[in-house]
Design a protein with these regions (language model features):
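Flexible, small-/acidic-enriched active-site or ligand-binding loops
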Residues: 144, 199-227
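Hydrophobic, small-residue-rich alpha-helical packing segments that form membrane-like cores
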Residues: 136-141, 156
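Alpha-helical interface subdomain recognition
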Residues: 1-85, 94, 107-112, 119, ...
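A short, Trp-centered hydrophobic/proline-enriched beta-strand micro-motif
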Residues: 123-133
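A short, charged helix-loop
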Residues: 219-246
């Protein structure tokens, strides 16, 4: 499909198999999964269903077991996956694994791809991306990175503390950001592949966050003289921040894709309730205040999708996408939050329950305005670039 063209008819055709799979195979399992909690046993079960349907990791390279979908097609598939809180997990297109797959596909050596990317795509293990640190370390400002990598004979020793590391508990390996140390060390950050069995990789407690949609939660991690060989360096030493952009730009957009699907689900549930519930002798959906909530959601869903498809096409055409993805992430994270908030209001008491699913989506989606950079950090960067363009003109 031409990257510059994606029509509603295209989206309907591309998304239909995923839509049918989510409706028939995944949504019926939601309440049981919410009650029991998400774990690797559930992940394996769900991913087997997706594999049987030919829908496992549709966005990943075909040569490593994925579906090989381009980025424009992925915008449709991942939105449909996000229609259920379990959908991205089932289809192996959830964070952080989806972003790590893309990073490995672009940056890793052939040996690293066979060792890490192939089993990750197949769902044989999970991964995590370890950059965020306790203050005053790396967070919204990644250049504040404090984790150190000291060069020794045959490899590196990693030391530092990480937190909010999504999926760390139970992950098979981590991609760790660290700053090289030593007289001949390259400036800047470097990336290292660390196996979960490394004695210096210590996963602590899971942080109790309002979202509950990730297997392995968000954990504190310590690195204490964690030795990795020279073959564990991912990409070029000293180019970790540049390599991180390879991951972060698409990851911002795939977050948008999944959460757009979740927001649409919350809206659909609320509208269905409004159409069938009577209030003060009239259908709820006929009341002016309810109609405003519904209409505003309809408008913002279309606006989110239009912006997302545009930026996905630009990235597919080779645009670096740093600013484009930043703008999309701010707008879509905030708009989907508003959409789900209106859905809660429209659904009333049912809107705050997991039984309606809206409550689950509401708790999960709030963190989207913080993940992959808070809105304020993105706005500051967008504004700086705008001023710089005027000054250069």
């Amino acid at each position: 499909m031409p990257h510059s063209v994606l029509t509603p008819a295209d989206a309907e055709r591309l998304g239909q198999p995923v839509r049918r799979f989510i409706a028939d195979s995944i949504i019926p399992l939601e309440q049981q999964a919410f009650a029991a909690g998400l774990d690797d046993k559930l992940r394996v079960r769900l991913q087997q269903l997706a594999n049987d349907a030919g829908l496992l990791a549709p966005q990943a390279p075909a040569e490593f077991g994925g579906g090989g979908a381009d980025f424009v097609t992925s915008a449709v598939l991942l939105e449909e996956a996000g229609y259920s809180p379990l959908g991205p997990l089932a289809m192996n297109c959830s964070a952080p694994d989806e972003g790590n797959m893309h990073l490995l596909a672009v940056v890793a050596t052939a040996e690293q791809k066979d060792r890490y990317l192939r089993p990750l795509v197949r769902g044989e293990l999970r991964s995590c991306f370890a950059m965020t640190e306790p203050a005053p370390g790396a967070g919204s400002d990644p250049t504040a990175l404090r984790t150190l990598a000291r060069k020794v004979a045959g490899g590196w020793l990693l030391d530092g503390d990480k937190h909010f590391i999504t999926g760390a508990d139970g992950a098979g390996f981590a991609i760790v950001m660290a700053r090289a140390q030593g007289p001949d060390a390259p400036e800047g950050a470097s990336m290292f592949l660390v196996d979960a069995g490394n004695p210096g990789w210590q996963v602590g407690d899971q942080m109790r966050t309002i979202d509950a949609g990730t297997v392995g939660g968000h954990s504190r991690v310590q690195l204490r003289e964690a030795f990795v060989g020279d073959d564990a360096v991912l990409g070029e030493p000293g180019r970790g921040f540049a390599h991180a952009q390879v991951r972060l730009v698409p990851a911002r957009l795939t977050h948008c894709m999944r959460w757009l699907g979740a927001a649409r689900r919350a809206h659909d549930i609320a509208v269905r309730r409004a159409s069938g519930r009577e209030l003060f002798g009239a259908p709820l959906g006929s009341l002016g205040m309810a109609q405003q909530l519904i209409a505003d959601n309809e408008i913002e869903l279309v606006a989110c999708r239009a912006l997302l498809w545009q930026v996905a096409a630009q990235v597919a055409q080779g645009v670096k996408g740093t600013e484009e993805s930043s703008r999309a992430k701010v707008f879509i994270s905030e708009a989907t939050g508003r959409i789900v908030d209106r859905a809660v209001q429209l659904a009333g008491g049912a809107g705050v329950t997991e039984e309606s699913v809206i409550g689950r989506i509401y708790a999960d989606i709030r963190a989207f305005r913080i993940y992959d950079g808070p809105s304020e950090a993105h706005r500051a960067a967008i504004a700086r670039r705008a001023v710089a363009r005027i000054e250069r003109a």
